[in-house]
């Protein structure tokens, strides 16, 4: 799905996002409660000369889980090794990663909910006892070899905390859920990022981009890059509200942050007249896979009250009808 408001990382974004990513808590905007607690835990671990306990970050994509992992690495003065669960296909893959860690290293696993049960079994003793149990052979002749590992901190990131097994989730001593950002926070992020791109972004322009960014920093930064293109073509060093509006309208992102796919989704639900539509039916109608709908399209709509998710399916709320400028008919239960 080729969308400018796509939340998943694009490969070409990696270098760009890294250059705009804050390296310490002083430069990190938002998630104040999480920052406050992490600062305490990091200071305590450094005072005791210990590794941090294992950390789990959950929440919608694009809110800064990877950024926080890198900041923790910086604040702890530790090396960080990054991977993603889909890349760990066999227990041997995980064993190779773990045995290459040094004392005090941080291992960051993105999409950790996608680890297979067999991989999780290898991870349990590594997290609890800093030990790797390797089974040699099979059947009655099988032997278990125990390998000691250096003490390390595992940081897991997930958009679906509910898909983690209880044994894995319980092994994380610190668990934080990242929340969507306020427009004012995103505007500050955008103005700081614009300076790194050798531009000045007016406050009104930053707020205009922010309110169309689905409360998500990754989307806000991606939109900023596209707005910058419009400014560059017009030889403008300052990004104005007028230029931001022109660029965003040209990109097909409306004032609510919806693009064509969001509008198709909401039109499908509102056309059902308050009858729930199942996920499989929505996926078929939109020609999208169910994971994309659950992980990319729905989180923002759910968080902002545009849709309701029931046991029977999805229902458009009154807010959706208003967004599409449609009349909303109350159900018998609402009257």
From Swiss-Prot:
Instruction: List the PANTHER family hit by this protein, alphabetically.
Output: HOLLIDAY JUNCTION BRANCH MIGRATION COMPLEX SUBUNIT RUVB (PTHR42848:SF1), PTHR42848
Q: Where in the cell is it found?
A: Cytoplasm
Entry EC number(s): 3.6.4.-
Entry text on domains: Has 3 domains, the large (RuvB-L) and small ATPase (RuvB-S) domains and the C-terminal head (RuvB-H) domain. The head domain binds DNA, while the ATPase domains jointly bind ATP, ADP or are empty depending on the state of the subunit in the translocation cycle. During a single DNA translocation step the structure of each domain remains the same, but their relative positions change.
The record's listing under NCBIfam families reads: PRK00080.1, ruvB
Q: What is its main location?
A: cytoplasm
Which species does this protein come from? Campylobacter jejuni subsp. jejuni serotype O:6 (strain 81116 / NCTC 11828)
Q: Where is this region: Large ATPase domain (RuvB-L)?
A: 1-181
Enzyme superclass (EC): hydrolase
Residues annotated as binding Mg(2+): 66
Q: Which GO terms describe its cellular component?
A: cytoplasm; Holliday junction resolvase complex
Subunit note: Homohexamer. Forms an RuvA(8)-RuvB(12)-Holliday junction (HJ) complex. HJ DNA is sandwiched between 2 RuvA tetramers; dsDNA enters through RuvA and exits via RuvB. An RuvB hexamer assembles on each DNA strand where it exits the tetramer. Each RuvB hexamer is contacted by two RuvA subunits (via domain III) on 2 adjacent RuvB subunits; this complex drives branch migration. In the full resolvosome a probable DNA-RuvA(4)-RuvB(12)-RuvC(2) complex forms which resolves the HJ.
Q: Name one GO molecular function term.
A: ATP hydrolysis activity
What name goes with this protein?
Holliday junction branch migration complex subunit RuvB
What reactions does this protein catalyze?
ATP + H2O = ADP + phosphate + H(+)
Entry's SUPFAM superfamilies?
P-loop containing nucleoside triphosphate hydrolases, Winged helix' DNA-binding domain
Q: Which residues bind ATP?
A: 20-21, 62, 65-67, 128-130, 171, 181, 218
């Amino acid at each position: 799905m080729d969308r400018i408001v796509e939340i998943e990382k694009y490969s070409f974004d990696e270098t760009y996002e890294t250059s705009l990513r804050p390296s310490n808590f002083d430069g990190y905007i938002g998630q104040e409660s999480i920052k406050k607690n992490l600062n305490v835990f990091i200071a305590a671990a450094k005072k005791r000369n210990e590794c941090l306990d294992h950390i789990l970050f959950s929440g919608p994509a694009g809110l800064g889980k990877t950024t926080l992992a890198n900041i923790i690495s910086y604040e702890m003065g530790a090396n960080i090794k990054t991977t993603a669960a889909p890349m760990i296909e066999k227990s041997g893959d995980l064993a190779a990663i773990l045995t290459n860690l040094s004392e005090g290293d941080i291992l960051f696993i993105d999409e950790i909910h996608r680890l297979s049960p067999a991989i999780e079994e290898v991870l349990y003793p590594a997290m609890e006892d800093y030990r790797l149990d390797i089974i040699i052979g099979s059947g009655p002749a099988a032997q278990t070899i125990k390998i000691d590992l250096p003490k390390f901190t595992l940081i897991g990131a997930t958009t679906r905390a509910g898909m983690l097994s209880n044994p894995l989730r319980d092994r994380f001593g610190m668990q934080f859920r990242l929340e969507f950002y306020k427009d004012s926070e995103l505007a500050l992020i955008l103005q700081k990022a614009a300076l790194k791109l050798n531009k000045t972004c007016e406050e009104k322009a930053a707020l205009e981009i922010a309110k169309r960014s689905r409360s998500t920093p990754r989307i806000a930064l991606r939109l900023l890059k596209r707005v910058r293109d419009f400014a560059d073509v017009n030889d403008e060093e300052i990004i104005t509200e007028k230029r931001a509006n022109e660029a965003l309208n040209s990109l097909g992102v409306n004032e609510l942050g919806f693009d064509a796919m969001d509008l198709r989704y909401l039109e499908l639900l509102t056309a059902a007249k308050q009858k729930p539509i199942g996920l499989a039916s929505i996926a078929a109608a939109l020609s999208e896979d169910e994971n994309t709908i659950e992980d990319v399209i729905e989180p923002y709509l759910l968080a902002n009250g545009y849709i309701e998710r029931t046991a029977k399916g999805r229902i458009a709320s009154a807010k959706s009808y208003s967004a599409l400028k449609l009349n909303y008919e109350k159900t018998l239960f609402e009257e």
